[in-house]
Design a protein with these regions (language model features):
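N-terminal accessory/interface modules of nucleic-acid-binding and processing proteins
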Residues: 1-174
Length: 174
Protein backbone atom coordinates (compact mmCIF):
# COMPACT_ATOMS: atom_id res chain seq x y z
CA UNK A 1 0.00 0.00 0.00
CA UNK A 2 1.54 3.27 -1.14
CA UNK A 3 0.69 6.56 0.52
CA UNK A 4 0.49 9.72 -1.51
CA UNK A 5 0.49 12.95 0.49
CA UNK A 6 -2.18 15.45 -0.48
CA UNK A 7 -2.57 19.06 0.48
CA UNK A 8 -6.08 20.20 1.37
CA UNK A 9 -7.19 23.68 2.19
CA UNK A 10 -10.00 24.63 4.52
CA UNK A 11 -11.79 27.89 5.07
CA UNK A 12 -11.82 28.68 8.77
CA UNK A 13 -13.76 31.42 10.54
CA UNK A 14 -13.29 32.86 13.99
CA UNK A 15 -16.62 32.04 15.65
CA UNK A 16 -16.51 35.32 17.58
CA UNK A 17 -16.61 37.22 14.28
CA UNK A 18 -19.79 35.59 12.97
CA UNK A 19 -23.37 36.76 13.30
CA UNK A 20 -26.66 34.89 13.32
CA UNK A 21 -25.46 31.46 14.40
CA UNK A 22 -27.19 29.62 17.22
CA UNK A 23 -24.28 27.86 18.86
CA UNK A 24 -25.98 26.77 22.07
CA UNK A 25 -26.74 23.38 20.55
CA UNK A 26 -23.34 23.02 18.87
CA UNK A 27 -20.90 23.90 21.64
CA UNK A 28 -21.17 22.32 25.04
CA UNK A 29 -19.46 24.13 27.89
CA UNK A 30 -16.23 22.75 29.29
CA UNK A 31 -16.72 20.97 32.61
CA UNK A 32 -15.59 23.15 35.48
CA UNK A 33 -12.82 21.58 37.49
CA UNK A 34 -12.97 22.21 41.22
CA UNK A 35 -10.42 24.83 42.17
CA UNK A 36 -9.20 24.95 45.75
CA UNK A 37 -7.32 28.22 46.25
CA UNK A 38 -4.03 28.05 48.12
CA UNK A 39 -4.11 31.00 50.54
CA UNK A 40 -0.32 31.21 51.02
CA UNK A 41 0.31 31.49 47.28
CA UNK A 42 -2.56 33.93 46.80
CA UNK A 43 -1.06 36.06 49.60
CA UNK A 44 2.35 35.97 47.90
CA UNK A 45 0.83 37.06 44.58
CA UNK A 46 -0.88 39.97 46.36
CA UNK A 47 2.13 40.95 48.47
CA UNK A 48 4.48 41.24 45.48
CA UNK A 49 2.31 43.81 43.75
CA UNK A 50 2.88 42.04 40.43
CA UNK A 51 0.22 42.76 37.82
CA UNK A 52 -1.18 39.30 37.07
CA UNK A 53 -3.74 38.90 34.27
CA UNK A 54 -5.73 35.68 33.94
CA UNK A 55 -6.72 35.58 30.28
CA UNK A 56 -5.85 33.68 27.16
CA UNK A 57 -4.25 30.26 26.97
CA UNK A 58 -0.55 30.97 27.41
CA UNK A 59 1.54 31.79 30.46
CA UNK A 60 4.31 34.36 30.13
CA UNK A 61 5.95 37.39 31.69
CA UNK A 62 5.81 40.48 29.46
CA UNK A 63 8.84 42.67 30.29
CA UNK A 64 7.65 45.64 28.20
CA UNK A 65 4.53 46.10 30.31
CA UNK A 66 5.88 44.36 33.43
CA UNK A 67 2.86 42.03 33.51
CA UNK A 68 2.37 38.34 34.12
CA UNK A 69 -0.19 36.58 31.93
CA UNK A 70 -1.70 33.28 33.01
CA UNK A 71 -4.43 31.18 31.43
CA UNK A 72 -7.69 31.30 33.34
CA UNK A 73 -7.74 29.00 36.35
CA UNK A 74 -10.41 26.70 34.96
CA UNK A 75 -8.10 25.77 32.07
CA UNK A 76 -5.68 23.99 34.42
CA UNK A 77 -6.11 20.37 35.46
CA UNK A 78 -5.86 21.40 39.10
CA UNK A 79 -5.02 24.33 41.36
CA UNK A 80 -1.46 23.12 42.00
CA UNK A 81 -0.54 23.39 38.32
CA UNK A 82 -2.07 26.86 38.09
CA UNK A 83 -0.01 28.01 41.07
CA UNK A 84 3.17 26.29 39.84
CA UNK A 85 2.80 28.14 36.54
CA UNK A 86 2.14 31.42 38.33
CA UNK A 87 5.19 30.97 40.56
CA UNK A 88 7.37 30.20 37.52
CA UNK A 89 6.26 33.45 35.87
CA UNK A 90 6.70 35.34 39.14
CA UNK A 91 10.37 34.29 39.19
CA UNK A 92 10.72 35.75 35.67
CA UNK A 93 9.08 38.93 37.01
CA UNK A 94 11.85 39.28 39.62
CA UNK A 95 14.40 39.64 36.81
CA UNK A 96 13.19 43.12 35.81
CA UNK A 97 15.74 45.93 35.97
CA UNK A 98 13.84 47.53 38.86
CA UNK A 99 14.09 44.32 40.89
CA UNK A 100 16.99 41.86 40.58
CA UNK A 101 18.15 43.05 37.13
CA UNK A 102 18.89 39.67 35.56
CA UNK A 103 19.95 39.93 31.97
CA UNK A 104 17.31 38.79 29.53
CA UNK A 105 16.73 39.41 25.89
CA UNK A 106 17.50 36.05 24.37
CA UNK A 107 15.19 34.64 21.76
CA UNK A 108 13.33 31.38 22.33
CA UNK A 109 15.81 28.53 22.02
CA UNK A 110 18.89 30.67 22.73
CA UNK A 111 21.28 29.88 25.57
CA UNK A 112 20.35 33.02 27.51
CA UNK A 113 16.64 32.19 27.18
CA UNK A 114 17.22 28.63 28.39
CA UNK A 115 19.32 29.94 31.30
CA UNK A 116 16.52 32.26 32.41
CA UNK A 117 14.09 29.33 32.14
CA UNK A 118 16.36 27.23 34.37
CA UNK A 119 16.41 30.07 36.92
CA UNK A 120 12.61 30.25 36.77
CA UNK A 121 12.23 26.47 37.15
CA UNK A 122 14.60 26.28 40.11
CA UNK A 123 13.10 29.36 41.75
CA UNK A 124 9.62 27.94 41.23
CA UNK A 125 10.68 24.64 42.82
CA UNK A 126 12.10 26.49 45.85
CA UNK A 127 8.86 28.48 46.21
CA UNK A 128 6.68 25.39 45.78
CA UNK A 129 8.49 23.66 48.65
CA UNK A 130 8.13 26.68 50.95
CA UNK A 131 4.47 27.21 50.05
CA UNK A 132 3.43 23.55 50.07
CA UNK A 133 2.50 23.38 46.38
CA UNK A 134 2.82 20.00 44.66
CA UNK A 135 2.53 20.55 40.92
CA UNK A 136 4.45 19.68 37.80
CA UNK A 137 7.64 21.44 36.77
CA UNK A 138 7.62 22.20 33.03
CA UNK A 139 11.07 21.89 31.50
CA UNK A 140 11.05 19.27 28.74
CA UNK A 141 11.78 21.71 25.91
CA UNK A 142 14.92 23.09 27.60
CA UNK A 143 16.68 19.92 28.74
CA UNK A 144 18.93 19.62 25.66
CA UNK A 145 20.13 23.20 26.01
CA UNK A 146 20.71 22.78 29.75
CA UNK A 147 22.69 19.57 29.25
CA UNK A 148 24.91 21.20 26.63
CA UNK A 149 25.52 24.19 28.89
CA UNK A 150 26.26 21.92 31.87
CA UNK A 151 28.87 20.07 29.81
CA UNK A 152 30.43 23.33 28.61
CA UNK A 153 30.48 25.10 31.99
CA UNK A 154 30.52 23.25 35.30
CA UNK A 155 29.44 26.44 37.12
CA UNK A 156 26.26 26.77 35.04
CA UNK A 157 23.95 25.00 37.49
CA UNK A 158 25.44 26.87 40.45
CA UNK A 159 24.99 30.24 38.72
CA UNK A 160 21.37 29.37 37.91
CA UNK A 161 20.72 28.10 41.44
CA UNK A 162 22.25 31.25 42.92
CA UNK A 163 20.03 33.49 40.76
CA UNK A 164 17.00 31.32 41.60
CA UNK A 165 17.82 31.56 45.30
CA UNK A 166 17.99 35.36 45.05
CA UNK A 167 14.59 35.41 43.33
CA UNK A 168 13.17 33.10 45.99
CA UNK A 169 14.52 35.30 48.79
CA UNK A 170 13.27 38.47 47.05
CA UNK A 171 9.75 37.05 46.82
CA UNK A 172 9.56 35.42 50.24
CA UNK A 173 11.15 38.24 52.22
CA UNK A 174 9.30 40.95 50.32
Amino acid sequence: LERIPMLKSFTVFNIEQTDGLNLDDEISPQPVIGFDPLPDVEALFQRTGAKINERGQQAFYQPLTDEIWLPERHLFTDAANFYATGLHELVHWTGAKSRLDRQKGGKFGSESYAFEELIAELGCAFLMVDLGVSGEVQHESYIASWLKSLKDDKRYIFQAASAASKAHRFLMEG
